[in-house]
Amino acid sequence: MQKQSTTMLSDLPKDVAEEVLSKFPVTSLRRVRFTCKKLNTLSKDMSFTRKHIDKEEAKKKQSKEFHVVMMLDFRVSLFSLNLLNPNPIERLGQLVSLDGGAQVDISNIFHCEGFLLCTTKDISRVVVWNPCVGQTIWIKPRNSFNKWDRYALGYDVMKNHKVLRFVDDGEYGRRHLLCEFEIYSFESDSWEVLDVNPDWEIDFVHRGLSIDGNSYWFARDKVVPYGGQDPSYFLLCFDFTTERFRPPLPLPFQPYFGDTVALSSVGDNQIAVLCQRSSSPYTLKIWISSKVEPNAVSWNKLFLKVDMKPLTGNSFSYSGGSFFVDEEKKMAVVLDKNIGGGFDPTRNIAYIIGKEGYFKKVDLGESRHL
Protein backbone atom coordinates (compact mmCIF):
# COMPACT_ATOMS: atom_id res chain seq x y z
CA MET A 1 0.00 0.00 0.00
CA GLN A 2 1.43 3.31 -1.07
CA LYS A 3 2.01 5.74 1.73
CA GLN A 4 0.20 9.03 1.25
CA SER A 5 2.22 12.21 1.60
CA THR A 6 1.04 14.94 3.92
CA THR A 7 1.08 18.55 2.80
CA MET A 8 1.82 21.01 5.59
CA LEU A 9 0.49 24.58 5.56
CA SER A 10 4.08 25.75 5.53
CA ASP A 11 4.63 23.89 2.22
CA LEU A 12 1.93 25.83 0.38
CA PRO A 13 2.76 28.60 -2.12
CA LYS A 14 2.30 32.12 -0.77
CA ASP A 15 -0.91 32.84 -2.71
CA VAL A 16 -2.51 29.58 -1.52
CA ALA A 17 -1.36 30.17 2.05
CA GLU A 18 -2.88 33.66 1.91
CA GLU A 19 -6.20 32.19 0.82
CA VAL A 20 -6.12 29.67 3.69
CA LEU A 21 -5.22 32.33 6.25
CA SER A 22 -7.97 34.63 4.96
CA LYS A 23 -10.55 32.05 6.08
CA PHE A 24 -9.59 32.56 9.70
CA PRO A 25 -11.48 35.24 11.64
CA VAL A 26 -9.42 38.20 12.78
CA THR A 27 -9.69 37.07 16.41
CA SER A 28 -7.95 33.76 15.55
CA LEU A 29 -4.97 35.16 13.67
CA ARG A 30 -2.89 35.66 16.78
CA ARG A 31 -3.13 31.94 17.59
CA VAL A 32 -2.34 31.06 13.96
CA ARG A 33 0.98 32.91 14.25
CA PHE A 34 2.33 30.25 16.60
CA THR A 35 1.62 27.30 14.24
CA CYS A 36 4.62 27.81 12.00
CA LYS A 37 7.23 30.38 11.08
CA LYS A 38 5.97 30.89 7.51
CA LEU A 39 2.40 31.64 8.58
CA ASN A 40 3.69 33.92 11.30
CA THR A 41 5.65 35.93 8.71
CA LEU A 42 2.76 35.96 6.25
CA SER A 43 0.20 37.08 8.83
CA LYS A 44 2.43 40.06 9.64
CA ASP A 45 2.64 41.08 5.98
CA MET A 46 0.98 44.48 5.48
CA SER A 47 -0.55 43.59 2.11
CA PHE A 48 -2.05 40.43 3.58
CA THR A 49 -3.48 42.40 6.50
CA ARG A 50 -5.15 44.80 4.07
CA LYS A 51 -6.70 41.89 2.11
CA HIS A 52 -7.90 40.20 5.29
CA ILE A 53 -9.53 43.38 6.57
CA ASP A 54 -11.27 43.93 3.22
CA LYS A 55 -12.77 40.42 3.36
CA GLU A 56 -13.89 40.88 6.95
CA GLU A 57 -15.54 44.20 6.11
CA ALA A 58 -17.36 42.66 3.13
CA LYS A 59 -18.81 39.98 5.40
CA LYS A 60 -19.92 42.56 7.96
CA LYS A 61 -21.53 44.70 5.26
CA GLN A 62 -23.66 41.76 4.15
CA SER A 63 -24.81 41.20 7.73
CA LYS A 64 -25.49 44.94 8.30
CA GLU A 65 -22.83 44.88 11.01
CA PHE A 66 -19.44 46.51 11.19
CA HIS A 67 -16.60 46.54 13.66
CA VAL A 68 -14.84 49.64 14.95
CA VAL A 69 -11.81 50.09 17.16
CA MET A 70 -12.34 52.65 19.90
CA MET A 71 -10.22 53.89 22.77
CA LEU A 72 -12.05 54.24 26.08
CA ASP A 73 -10.26 54.99 29.35
CA PHE A 74 -6.75 54.42 27.98
CA ARG A 75 -7.68 50.99 26.59
CA VAL A 76 -8.22 49.96 22.97
CA SER A 77 -11.32 47.82 22.43
CA LEU A 78 -13.18 46.27 19.52
CA PHE A 79 -16.88 47.15 19.21
CA SER A 80 -19.63 45.74 17.02
CA LEU A 81 -22.14 48.22 15.57
CA ASN A 82 -25.47 47.11 14.14
CA LEU A 83 -27.93 49.96 14.19
CA LEU A 84 -30.85 47.60 13.48
CA ASN A 85 -30.35 45.66 16.73
CA PRO A 86 -32.10 46.57 20.02
CA ASN A 87 -28.59 46.66 21.51
CA PRO A 88 -26.84 48.50 18.65
CA ILE A 89 -23.37 48.86 20.20
CA GLU A 90 -21.62 45.93 21.82
CA ARG A 91 -18.10 45.75 23.17
CA LEU A 92 -16.59 42.52 21.81
CA GLY A 93 -13.53 42.74 23.98
CA GLN A 94 -10.41 44.61 24.86
CA LEU A 95 -7.52 44.15 22.46
CA VAL A 96 -4.54 42.34 23.92
CA SER A 97 -1.71 44.08 25.70
CA LEU A 98 0.82 45.77 23.45
CA ASP A 99 3.79 44.11 25.12
CA GLY A 100 2.18 40.82 26.10
CA GLY A 101 2.62 41.61 29.78
CA ALA A 102 1.11 44.28 31.97
CA GLN A 103 -1.45 46.53 30.33
CA VAL A 104 -0.11 49.77 28.86
CA ASP A 105 -2.18 52.94 29.19
CA ILE A 106 -2.74 54.49 25.75
CA SER A 107 -3.39 58.22 25.39
CA ASN A 108 -3.92 58.53 21.61
CA ILE A 109 -4.36 56.27 18.60
CA PHE A 110 -4.09 56.94 14.87
CA HIS A 111 -5.53 54.36 12.46
CA CYS A 112 -4.17 53.55 9.00
CA GLU A 113 -5.64 50.57 7.13
CA GLY A 114 -5.59 48.05 9.97
CA PHE A 115 -2.56 49.43 11.79
CA LEU A 116 -2.70 51.58 14.92
CA LEU A 117 -0.10 54.14 15.91
CA CYS A 118 -0.34 54.45 19.70
CA THR A 119 1.25 56.83 22.18
CA THR A 120 1.47 55.85 25.83
CA LYS A 121 -0.10 57.92 28.59
CA ASP A 122 3.29 58.56 30.22
CA ILE A 123 4.59 60.02 26.91
CA SER A 124 7.54 57.66 27.03
CA ARG A 125 6.82 55.42 24.03
CA VAL A 126 5.36 55.32 20.53
CA VAL A 127 4.35 52.04 18.94
CA VAL A 128 2.82 50.90 15.66
CA TRP A 129 0.55 47.96 16.38
CA ASN A 130 -1.18 45.37 14.21
CA PRO A 131 -3.92 44.20 16.63
CA CYS A 132 -5.07 41.44 14.24
CA VAL A 133 -1.89 39.43 14.73
CA GLY A 134 -0.30 41.06 17.78
CA GLN A 135 2.72 42.49 15.96
CA THR A 136 4.24 45.63 17.50
CA ILE A 137 7.05 47.94 16.41
CA TRP A 138 8.28 50.27 19.15
CA ILE A 139 9.80 53.47 17.78
CA LYS A 140 12.65 55.24 19.51
CA PRO A 141 12.72 59.07 19.43
CA ARG A 142 15.38 61.03 17.59
CA ASN A 143 15.90 63.07 20.75
CA SER A 144 12.86 62.83 23.00
CA PHE A 145 9.07 62.76 22.86
CA ASN A 146 6.95 65.72 24.03
CA LYS A 147 3.53 65.78 25.69
CA TRP A 148 2.25 68.09 22.90
CA ASP A 149 3.43 65.84 20.08
CA ARG A 150 1.03 65.03 17.24
CA TYR A 151 1.49 61.90 15.14
CA ALA A 152 0.26 60.40 11.89
CA LEU A 153 0.85 57.05 10.21
CA GLY A 154 0.82 56.76 6.42
CA TYR A 155 2.63 55.45 3.37
CA ASP A 156 4.03 56.68 0.05
CA VAL A 157 3.23 55.50 -3.48
CA MET A 158 5.66 52.59 -3.03
CA LYS A 159 3.71 51.46 0.07
CA ASN A 160 6.61 52.36 2.36
CA HIS A 161 5.10 53.14 5.75
CA LYS A 162 6.20 56.23 7.67
CA VAL A 163 5.35 58.14 10.85
CA LEU A 164 5.00 61.92 10.99
CA ARG A 165 5.72 63.60 14.32
CA PHE A 166 5.24 67.31 14.90
CA VAL A 167 4.86 69.80 17.71
CA ASP A 168 4.23 73.52 17.16
CA ASP A 169 3.95 75.36 20.45
CA GLY A 170 4.11 79.02 19.50
CA GLU A 171 2.21 82.05 18.20
CA TYR A 172 2.20 83.64 14.77
CA GLY A 173 4.56 86.63 14.56
CA ARG A 174 6.33 85.64 17.77
CA ARG A 175 9.25 83.40 18.63
CA HIS A 176 8.32 79.73 18.49
CA LEU A 177 8.67 78.13 21.90
CA LEU A 178 8.97 74.72 20.25
CA CYS A 179 8.56 73.86 16.59
CA GLU A 180 9.64 70.43 15.37
CA PHE A 181 8.59 68.42 12.32
CA GLU A 182 10.18 65.07 11.55
CA ILE A 183 9.37 61.83 9.75
CA TYR A 184 10.30 58.25 10.60
CA SER A 185 10.85 55.65 7.89
CA PHE A 186 10.35 51.97 8.72
CA GLU A 187 12.53 51.08 5.74
CA SER A 188 15.58 52.95 7.05
CA ASP A 189 14.64 52.78 10.75
CA SER A 190 15.57 56.44 11.14
CA TRP A 191 14.13 59.94 11.63
CA GLU A 192 14.57 62.83 9.21
CA VAL A 193 13.95 66.48 10.13
CA LEU A 194 11.49 68.33 7.88
CA ASP A 195 11.78 72.01 7.02
CA VAL A 196 8.31 73.36 7.90
CA ASN A 197 7.43 76.89 8.99
CA PRO A 198 3.63 76.76 9.33
CA ASP A 199 1.30 79.73 9.04
CA TRP A 200 -1.48 77.43 10.26
CA GLU A 201 -2.16 75.54 13.48
CA ILE A 202 -3.92 72.35 14.51
CA ASP A 203 -5.59 72.24 17.91
CA PHE A 204 -4.19 69.49 20.09
CA VAL A 205 -7.64 67.89 20.53
CA HIS A 206 -8.09 67.45 16.77
CA ARG A 207 -6.86 64.05 15.70
CA GLY A 208 -6.11 63.43 12.07
CA LEU A 209 -7.24 60.58 9.86
CA SER A 210 -5.74 58.54 7.04
CA ILE A 211 -7.11 58.38 3.48
CA ASP A 212 -5.17 56.48 0.79
CA GLY A 213 -1.97 56.68 2.83
CA ASN A 214 -2.09 60.45 3.40
CA SER A 215 -3.19 62.25 6.57
CA TYR A 216 -5.80 64.99 6.99
CA TRP A 217 -6.55 67.39 9.84
CA PHE A 218 -8.88 70.18 10.78
CA ALA A 219 -6.66 73.31 10.79
CA ARG A 220 -6.93 77.10 10.92
CA ASP A 221 -4.90 80.18 10.10
CA LYS A 222 -2.37 81.14 12.71
CA VAL A 223 -3.28 84.73 13.55
CA VAL A 224 -1.70 87.40 15.73
CA PRO A 225 -3.34 87.30 19.19
CA TYR A 226 -5.83 90.12 19.81
CA GLY A 227 -5.37 91.29 16.25
CA GLY A 228 -9.11 91.49 15.65
CA GLN A 229 -8.95 89.00 12.79
CA ASP A 230 -10.98 85.78 12.80
CA PRO A 231 -9.06 82.76 11.50
CA SER A 232 -10.24 80.74 8.52
CA TYR A 233 -10.68 76.99 8.99
CA PHE A 234 -9.77 74.39 6.39
CA LEU A 235 -8.72 70.80 5.75
CA LEU A 236 -4.97 70.20 5.73
CA CYS A 237 -3.23 67.24 4.08
CA PHE A 238 0.21 65.79 4.71
CA ASP A 239 1.44 63.91 1.63
CA PHE A 240 3.65 60.97 2.65
CA THR A 241 5.08 60.64 -0.87
CA THR A 242 6.40 64.20 -1.13
CA GLU A 243 6.77 64.45 2.67
CA ARG A 244 5.17 67.89 2.58
CA PHE A 245 1.99 69.57 3.75
CA ARG A 246 -0.23 70.46 0.82
CA PRO A 247 -2.11 73.79 0.39
CA PRO A 248 -5.31 74.22 2.46
CA LEU A 249 -8.48 72.51 1.21
CA PRO A 250 -11.97 74.05 1.61
CA LEU A 251 -14.54 72.92 4.18
CA PRO A 252 -18.30 73.01 3.52
CA PHE A 253 -18.73 75.38 6.52
CA GLN A 254 -16.87 77.84 8.73
CA PRO A 255 -17.16 77.21 12.48
CA TYR A 256 -17.56 79.89 15.13
CA PHE A 257 -15.84 80.08 18.50
CA GLY A 258 -17.16 77.30 20.74
CA ASP A 259 -18.59 75.12 17.97
CA THR A 260 -17.93 71.38 18.07
CA VAL A 261 -16.09 70.05 15.02
CA ALA A 262 -14.72 66.61 14.14
CA LEU A 263 -13.52 64.45 11.23
CA SER A 264 -14.26 60.82 10.39
CA SER A 265 -13.45 58.47 7.52
CA VAL A 266 -16.17 56.93 5.36
CA GLY A 267 -15.20 53.71 3.62
CA ASP A 268 -11.65 53.63 2.32
CA ASN A 269 -11.35 57.01 0.61
CA GLN A 270 -13.91 59.57 1.78
CA ILE A 271 -14.14 62.02 4.67
CA ALA A 272 -17.09 63.09 6.82
CA VAL A 273 -17.03 66.40 8.69
CA LEU A 274 -19.24 67.27 11.66
CA CYS A 275 -20.10 70.71 12.98
CA GLN A 276 -22.43 71.45 15.88
CA ARG A 277 -23.22 75.05 16.73
CA SER A 278 -22.61 76.10 20.33
CA SER A 279 -25.79 78.20 20.52
CA SER A 280 -29.41 77.03 20.74
CA PRO A 281 -30.87 74.97 19.04
CA TYR A 282 -27.39 73.37 18.85
CA THR A 283 -27.81 72.35 15.22
CA LEU A 284 -25.65 69.42 14.16
CA LYS A 285 -24.64 69.05 10.50
CA ILE A 286 -22.61 66.35 8.76
CA TRP A 287 -21.21 66.45 5.22
CA ILE A 288 -19.49 63.65 3.27
CA SER A 289 -16.90 64.26 0.57
CA SER A 290 -17.36 63.15 -3.02
CA LYS A 291 -13.62 63.35 -3.80
CA VAL A 292 -10.54 63.58 -1.61
CA GLU A 293 -7.03 64.05 -2.97
CA PRO A 294 -3.96 65.76 -1.49
CA ASN A 295 -4.58 68.86 -3.63
CA ALA A 296 -8.39 68.79 -4.07
CA VAL A 297 -11.60 68.03 -2.20
CA SER A 298 -15.27 68.34 -3.13
CA TRP A 299 -18.33 67.85 -0.94
CA ASN A 300 -21.68 66.20 -1.48
CA LYS A 301 -24.87 67.84 -0.31
CA LEU A 302 -25.60 67.87 3.41
CA PHE A 303 -25.75 64.29 4.76
CA LEU A 304 -27.55 64.99 8.04
CA LYS A 305 -28.99 68.03 9.82
CA VAL A 306 -30.55 67.76 13.30
CA ASP A 307 -31.46 70.33 15.96
CA MET A 308 -30.10 68.71 19.13
CA LYS A 309 -31.83 70.89 21.76
CA PRO A 310 -35.02 68.74 21.92
CA LEU A 311 -32.87 65.58 22.09
CA THR A 312 -29.96 66.37 24.44
CA GLY A 313 -30.74 69.88 25.66
CA ASN A 314 -27.24 71.14 24.90
CA SER A 315 -24.20 70.73 22.69
CA PHE A 316 -21.63 67.96 22.90
CA SER A 317 -18.93 68.32 25.53
CA TYR A 318 -15.84 68.77 23.40
CA SER A 319 -14.42 69.18 19.92
CA GLY A 320 -12.23 66.63 18.23
CA GLY A 321 -14.32 63.69 19.40
CA SER A 322 -15.18 60.58 17.41
CA PHE A 323 -18.18 59.83 15.24
CA PHE A 324 -19.19 57.32 12.57
CA VAL A 325 -21.72 57.49 9.78
CA ASP A 326 -23.84 54.80 8.14
CA GLU A 327 -24.59 56.10 4.65
CA GLU A 328 -27.13 53.40 3.89
CA LYS A 329 -29.25 54.04 6.99
CA LYS A 330 -28.62 57.81 7.00
CA MET A 331 -27.49 57.65 10.62
CA ALA A 332 -24.56 58.86 12.67
CA VAL A 333 -23.04 57.63 15.93
CA VAL A 334 -21.44 60.40 18.00
CA LEU A 335 -19.27 59.55 21.02
CA ASP A 336 -19.29 61.95 23.95
CA LYS A 337 -18.98 62.12 27.73
CA ASN A 338 -21.76 62.82 30.21
CA ILE A 339 -19.99 64.87 32.86
CA GLY A 340 -21.25 63.82 36.30
CA GLY A 341 -22.18 66.38 38.94
CA GLY A 342 -21.29 66.10 42.62
CA PHE A 343 -20.49 62.47 43.38
CA ASP A 344 -21.94 61.19 40.09
CA PRO A 345 -19.30 59.63 37.82
CA THR A 346 -18.61 60.76 34.28
CA ARG A 347 -19.91 58.23 31.74
CA ASN A 348 -19.01 57.38 28.15
CA ILE A 349 -22.05 57.91 25.93
CA ALA A 350 -22.85 57.08 22.30
CA TYR A 351 -25.64 59.02 20.58
CA ILE A 352 -27.26 57.42 17.54
CA ILE A 353 -28.84 60.15 15.42
CA GLY A 354 -30.88 59.82 12.25
CA LYS A 355 -33.37 61.61 10.08
CA GLU A 356 -37.00 62.31 11.01
CA GLY A 357 -36.19 62.61 14.70
CA TYR A 358 -34.56 59.21 15.24
CA PHE A 359 -32.46 59.33 18.42
CA LYS A 360 -31.02 56.76 20.81
CA LYS A 361 -28.65 57.16 23.74
CA VAL A 362 -26.35 54.23 24.62
CA ASP A 363 -24.41 54.15 27.90
CA LEU A 364 -20.93 52.67 27.34
CA GLY A 365 -19.99 52.67 31.01
CA GLU A 366 -18.22 54.79 33.58
CA SER A 367 -15.26 56.87 32.43
CA ARG A 368 -12.02 57.24 34.33
CA HIS A 369 -10.61 59.60 31.68
CA LEU A 370 -12.12 63.07 32.23
UniProtKB/Swiss-Prot annotation:
Question: What name is this protein filed under?
Answer: F-box protein At2g18780
Taxonomically, what lineage is the organism?
Eukaryota, Viridiplantae, Streptophyta, Embryophyta, Tracheophyta
| Residue span, F-box domain | 6-52
Q: Which organism is it from?
A: Arabidopsis thaliana (Mouse-ear cress)
- One Pfam match, given by its short name, reads FBA_1
